[in-house]
């Protein structure tokens, strides 16, 4: 799963803490947050100091202003308190994105990299698949490998350094792959994709073993050309000012 804030944002013109809390947004800029998702419910408000994720309990459009009401309901476990203060004119509102990437079969039976976008509607309790359908991203992707780069300090009681010294699988994260602390010390991701051609190749296939991020892959003898593509992704917010 990949969670991030949208590149598009709208100006926050007013903010009041409490339960409910209210956030006023510039109505002229609001459409940029609904262009990719007509009814977003999960947002992030951020300035140069901090960021807070929340679910909108209700969204009301007025004259020049969109007002978002936030209550301790739905997926919100706590209310906005006095520590969550954002000055008008300095904070921006972002749509919070949640994507899952996975390998599946498309309607033609071909292996494909899919992307599913999830949302929680304003005031709702359940996470739903946006549009009800997953999106085909790349056809021909047969395998996906992931490795995670962790900070040199994995003890949650100590401050992170921003220095990476370990590349691990999801099951091998320190101090515990099932805890939030281990994932919060991830500062980078390595991605490996095995992609195959649509047709059989005329050239003779190589005999050397195929590896993706160090994992040896067993390939079928179907005559198709295959190649592995690898990349490194740095999580800048974890590496700088964590």
For the regions a protein language model found, what residue spans apply to each?
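Short linear sequence signals and composition-biased patches located at protein termini or domain-edge surfaces
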Residues: 74-75, 86-114, 119-242
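Autoprocessing Asn-cyclization modules and mimics
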Residues: 1-78
